[in-house]
UniProtKB/Swiss-Prot annotation:
GO biological process: translation
Keyword Ribonucleoprotein on entry: yes
NCBIfam families per record: L12 (TIGR00855)
GO cellular component: cytosolic large ribosomal subunit
Taxonomic source organism: Geobacter sulfurreducens (strain ATCC 51573 / DSM 12127 / PCA)
Compositional bias per record (Basic and acidic residues), positions renumbered to this chain: 105-117
Pfam families in alphabetical order: Ribosomal_L12, Ribosomal_L12_N
Ribonucleoprotein among keywords: yes
Family under the similarity heading: Belongs to the bacterial ribosomal protein bL12 family.
Protein name: Large ribosomal subunit protein bL12
Self-association state and partner proteins as the record states: Homodimer. Part of the ribosomal stalk of the 50S ribosomal subunit. Forms a multimeric L10(L12)X complex, where L10 forms an elongated spine to which 2 to 4 L12 dimers bind in a sequential fashion. Binds GTP-bound translation factors.
Job description of the protein: Forms part of the ribosomal stalk which helps the ribosome interact with GTP-bound translation factors. Is thus essential for accurate translation.
Keywords of this entry: Ribonucleoprotein, Ribosomal protein
Protein backbone atom coordinates (compact mmCIF):
# COMPACT_ATOMS: atom_id res chain seq x y z
CA UNK A 1 0.00 0.00 0.00
CA UNK A 2 1.36 3.43 -0.96
CA UNK A 3 2.04 5.84 1.88
CA UNK A 4 -0.10 8.98 1.96
CA UNK A 5 1.83 12.19 2.59
CA UNK A 6 0.67 15.44 4.14
CA UNK A 7 0.88 17.02 0.68
CA UNK A 8 -1.55 14.37 -0.64
CA UNK A 9 -4.02 15.16 2.15
CA UNK A 10 -3.76 18.92 1.56
CA UNK A 11 -4.22 18.44 -2.18
CA UNK A 12 -7.31 16.32 -1.56
CA UNK A 13 -8.81 18.89 0.84
CA UNK A 14 -8.14 21.73 -1.62
CA UNK A 15 -10.38 20.02 -4.17
CA UNK A 16 -13.34 19.55 -1.80
CA UNK A 17 -16.49 21.67 -1.93
CA UNK A 18 -17.59 23.77 1.04
CA UNK A 19 -20.30 21.25 1.92
CA UNK A 20 -17.85 18.34 1.78
CA UNK A 21 -15.44 20.26 4.03
CA UNK A 22 -18.21 20.99 6.53
CA UNK A 23 -19.13 17.30 6.64
CA UNK A 24 -15.46 16.35 7.09
CA UNK A 25 -15.07 18.77 9.99
CA UNK A 26 -18.22 17.39 11.67
CA UNK A 27 -16.98 13.80 11.26
CA UNK A 28 -13.56 14.70 12.69
CA UNK A 29 -15.20 16.48 15.64
CA UNK A 30 -17.35 13.41 16.33
CA UNK A 31 -14.51 10.91 15.90
CA UNK A 32 -12.02 12.71 18.13
CA UNK A 33 -14.49 14.33 20.53
CA UNK A 34 -13.27 17.86 19.83
CA UNK A 35 -14.79 21.09 18.60
CA UNK A 36 -13.39 23.38 15.90
CA UNK A 37 -14.40 26.31 18.14
CA UNK A 38 -12.28 25.09 21.08
CA UNK A 39 -9.60 27.84 20.83
CA UNK A 40 -12.31 30.49 21.09
CA UNK A 41 -13.81 28.75 24.13
CA UNK A 42 -10.41 28.60 25.85
CA UNK A 43 -9.86 32.32 25.32
CA UNK A 44 -13.37 33.08 26.55
CA UNK A 45 -12.92 30.90 29.65
CA UNK A 46 -10.68 33.55 31.21
CA UNK A 47 -13.53 36.09 31.05
CA UNK A 48 -16.57 36.00 33.35
CA UNK A 49 -19.24 33.53 32.25
CA UNK A 50 -21.79 36.19 31.26
CA UNK A 51 -19.25 38.05 29.14
CA UNK A 52 -18.19 34.80 27.47
CA UNK A 53 -21.77 34.00 26.48
CA UNK A 54 -22.32 37.49 25.06
CA UNK A 55 -19.07 37.34 23.09
CA UNK A 56 -19.89 33.90 21.73
CA UNK A 57 -23.35 34.97 20.56
CA UNK A 58 -21.94 37.93 18.64
CA UNK A 59 -19.25 35.98 16.78
CA UNK A 60 -21.53 33.79 14.68
CA UNK A 61 -24.06 35.13 12.21
CA UNK A 62 -26.57 33.57 9.81
CA UNK A 63 -27.17 34.98 6.33
CA UNK A 64 -30.87 34.58 5.46
CA UNK A 65 -32.13 34.95 1.88
CA UNK A 66 -35.55 36.61 2.28
CA UNK A 67 -36.40 36.82 -1.44
CA UNK A 68 -34.64 36.55 -4.79
CA UNK A 69 -36.04 39.76 -6.22
CA UNK A 70 -36.30 40.29 -9.98
CA UNK A 71 -32.89 38.83 -10.94
CA UNK A 72 -33.43 35.24 -9.80
CA UNK A 73 -30.76 33.78 -12.11
CA UNK A 74 -28.13 36.19 -10.80
CA UNK A 75 -29.05 35.33 -7.22
CA UNK A 76 -28.77 31.59 -7.97
CA UNK A 77 -25.26 32.18 -9.38
CA UNK A 78 -24.19 34.05 -6.25
CA UNK A 79 -25.71 31.38 -3.96
CA UNK A 80 -23.77 28.70 -5.87
CA UNK A 81 -20.53 30.69 -5.53
CA UNK A 82 -21.05 31.27 -1.79
CA UNK A 83 -22.14 27.76 -0.83
CA UNK A 84 -20.62 25.41 -3.39
CA UNK A 85 -24.07 23.94 -4.06
CA UNK A 86 -25.02 22.45 -7.40
CA UNK A 87 -27.40 24.26 -9.75
CA UNK A 88 -30.52 22.36 -8.66
CA UNK A 89 -29.76 22.73 -4.94
CA UNK A 90 -29.05 26.47 -5.31
CA UNK A 91 -32.27 26.95 -7.33
CA UNK A 92 -34.27 25.06 -4.69
CA UNK A 93 -32.75 27.23 -1.94
CA UNK A 94 -33.61 30.45 -3.83
CA UNK A 95 -37.13 29.21 -4.68
CA UNK A 96 -37.74 28.24 -1.05
CA UNK A 97 -36.82 31.68 0.37
CA UNK A 98 -36.75 32.71 3.17
CA UNK A 99 -33.93 30.25 3.85
CA UNK A 100 -30.45 30.45 5.39
CA UNK A 101 -27.62 30.67 2.86
CA UNK A 102 -24.78 30.54 5.40
CA UNK A 103 -24.94 29.61 9.09
CA UNK A 104 -22.52 30.35 11.91
CA UNK A 105 -20.12 32.56 9.95
CA UNK A 106 -18.05 35.53 11.08
CA UNK A 107 -19.45 39.04 10.82
CA UNK A 108 -17.06 39.87 7.98
CA UNK A 109 -18.04 36.78 5.99
CA UNK A 110 -21.75 37.45 6.62
CA UNK A 111 -21.42 41.08 5.48
CA UNK A 112 -19.52 40.03 2.33
CA UNK A 113 -22.15 37.38 1.49
CA UNK A 114 -24.95 39.92 2.07
CA UNK A 115 -23.19 42.47 -0.15
CA UNK A 116 -22.85 39.97 -3.01
CA UNK A 117 -26.46 38.82 -2.70
CA UNK A 118 -27.85 42.37 -2.52
CA UNK A 119 -25.79 43.38 -5.56
CA UNK A 120 -27.39 40.49 -7.47
CA UNK A 121 -30.87 41.76 -6.53
CA UNK A 122 -31.74 39.62 -3.51
CA UNK A 123 -33.30 40.75 -0.24
CA UNK A 124 -31.06 39.51 2.60
CA UNK A 125 -31.08 39.59 6.40
CA UNK A 126 -28.24 38.86 8.83
CA UNK A 127 -29.20 37.33 12.18
Amino acid sequence: MAEITKADVISFIENMTVLELAELVKELEDKFGVSAAAPVAVAAAAAPAAAAEAAEEKTEFDVILKSAGANKIGVIKVVRALTGLGLKEAKDLVDGAPKPVKNGVSKEEAEEAKKQLVESGAEVEIK
